[in-house]
Structure formats: C-alpha cells, structure tokens
C-alpha cells in the first residue's frame, strides 16, 4: 500500500476466485485495475477474469450490491423501516426519530487531522465493530509516562444542547474517559469515566447528563450531553488503565477499541449516523396508517 491507502484485504472465495478490496482516504474520481507481472509491474499482455466491481464509502468492503443501471444502496441512511428491540432482542417496535446530523466528518476513521493525538495512536481496522464489519479502531497509549488523550475541535451554536457518543470495547485497558473539555461548554470541563468491561460508570462530574447502552459482543454505546457556552469547543477522549487516572506509563501497545464517534445537536442521543469525510443528515422518520 502507498499514498492515501488505509487498508487492503483479500478473501479466498474458492475455485480460484478472490475478493480483493482497498480502502483509501481520498477523493476518488477513477478506479483502475489491470493484470500485473508482480507487485510493482503491470503487464501489457495476458488476461484475468473480473466480476462484481463495487465502490462504496467505508473502511471495509461490505456485501455485494447488484447495481445494474442504478446505484445499489444499503445501510442506516437508506429509506427503509427500522425496528428497535429491547435488551433481550424481543418486543420490536418501529423506530421513529427526528432529523439529526452527525457533525463530525469522520465517524469511523480517526487517523485524520481532525484529531490531535499527544501520546496516543489510532490503529484502523483492528476489531469487529458493532455493525459486524472488521472496522473498529484500536485506541492505544504510546510508551510515554504522561497524559494520553486525543481531542477534536467542533463548531457549535452557543446556548444549544449537544450530545456526543462513542462506541467502546475493552481491550488491554478497561476504562475510557470522555471529556467535554474547556470553556466552550457550560460549566467548563465536564467528564465521565466508563468501564467497558463491567458496563459501569466510575468518576463523573455533575451538571451533565450521560448514560450507556450495551450493544453485544462487549461493545457499549456511551453518550454525554451538555450545553454549548461558545461557538467553538473541544472534545477529548482518554484510554485509561484505571478510573480517572489520565497520566500513567504507557507500554506502546495497550488500549481500548472505539468506533462510531457522533456529535449531534440535541438533548438526547439518537441512532448512529455514519460519516465518511463530511457531516451527514438523517431525514426525519414518519409513519402513517
């Protein structure tokens, strides 16, 4: 891989067929594929069999969509009814939500300039995420004896409530701290600490609302709400060894898994809206009988 490549993968489908995929962080205007003599030299003669080309937004290849003469579509932004179930996977009900926008341009890809990363490292595609793809990120501390965190700046409307959420899963570390950081938020810095192994909160500040939902396979949806005090603010996330201890000796490999960062205007959390380079808006749901 080179340039803006994020990940490459191949799956053996049997009978000599392979499904090959390449993920890039770039504006794509053309896709080229050609026979090759080796890893660096293309051939001018010879042939290969190709089938079922697909270009999509995302960090991993998803199930093939037959597009014929129109674009194939799937996923949470498609105009299809959504059923919400209880924690036991029972008692389904139609999910109807107002229009919401995820204000973060990259909800699943964290290795961008949107995030400042002193003493931490993001590693893309290191675990299976809540959506079933191998597209969760390892969020680990480096080997420094220091504070380990990542932050992103956001543009807000002063006086409005905003809700930030992140999907987290324990790895070598169990704890994560989410901090609505600085004077851009009412009450200045407000933080929550969450144990992704037990599903319980540790040290938390007052003056904010927060909660979590189990997502299965060790994943938890963790969210926190506060009012904006300014038009700009900061969100910080810390991988932690223990509750509320942000400065420690890292080992360069240990951390937690994260997925699906979302910031939305509103006093409560809504369902996940994936973004791949720009803010995305989910239209309001409606139902008539």
Predicted feature residues:
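Glycine- and acidic residue-enriched flexible segments with recurrent GG/GxG motifs
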Residues: 1-289
